Amino acid sequence: MALPQSYRELTGEVATQMRALRKTQPDLMSAFAALAAAGTKEGALGEKTRELVALGIAIASRCDDCIGFHVQTLVKLGTTREEFEDLLATAVYMGGGPL
């Protein structure tokens, strides 16, 4: 299987798999959706900040599917190229540090 070339391609494939799971595992997928909503709701940190944190964690943990979905959300939230670059610098540092 070829690697996805864009976050849209990646998220499309995963979304198809998640739709199938919603049919066969509705309780699990409902719980996952509730967890995602609780973890990204407005609080002391705004939605964009929470998504930037989530993307940094996804990058450091090398979760391609997670990266795709968080990039997709951040694009919708108006994240600038400079913000993405700053986040990438920090994520690379945290994921590839000396310890």
Please give the residue ranges for each predicted region.
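Short acidic/histidine-centered micro-motifs embedded in hydrophobic/aromatic stretches
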Residues: L35, L55, L87-A91
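Short, thiol/selenol-centered motifs that function as redox-active sites or metal-ligating centers
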Residues: V53, I57-F69
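C-terminal structural segments of small proteins and small subunits
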Residues: E85-L99
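Iron-sulfur (Fe-S) cluster-binding segments and ferredoxin-like electron-carrier domains
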Residues: F69-F84
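Alpha-helical scaffolds flanking conserved acidic
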Residues: E47-L52, R81-L87
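Acidic, glycine/proline-rich low-complexity segments that act as flexible tails and inter-domain linkers
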Residues: M1-T49, V75
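Charged/polar positions within long, soluble alpha-helices
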Residues: A37, D65-G68, Q72, G96-L99
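A short, structure-level motif marking secondary-structure boundaries and short turns
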Residues: A20-L21, A54-G56, L99
